[in-house]
Amino acid sequence: MKKILITFFTVLFCLTSSVGWSLTKDDLVRRDDLYYKKFSDIQFTGKITGQFQGSFKNGKEDGSWIGYHKTGQLFYKWKYKDWLEDGSWVSYWMNGQLQYKGNYKNGKKEGSWVDYNKDGTIKRELTGTFKNDEKISD
């Protein structure tokens, strides 16, 4: 009987330790511009999976992010650094065509930004210095 119990608990331990808990953005709540795990007062640090995939550090979005439309089609790829937009930002229409692409640095648009129509043709292209998402100089 003792061997059976030891075997049972060993198998149970192995099974439960190999199951990982994955969180989605639905498992988080946003308060005061920070993200928390539901029913917690501790700012969330970790990765989420699902329709939106990325990392949080001390309640702030950090690192590379990928999002998908509900159809499974790629929606966006972008990056954060200390919760500010930083690096390449690309978004796609539900039909797979580019919607826009550009770069951010320290939360501000920088360089060239291109907006596309749903058929893939260029809607507008902006290059220069931006303020409040509007171009103010070359």
Residue ranges and their predicted role:
Residues C14-D138:
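Glycine/tyrosine- and acidic-biased, solvent-exposed loop/turn segments at the edges of beta-strands
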Residues I4-T16:
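Sec-dependent N-terminal signal peptides
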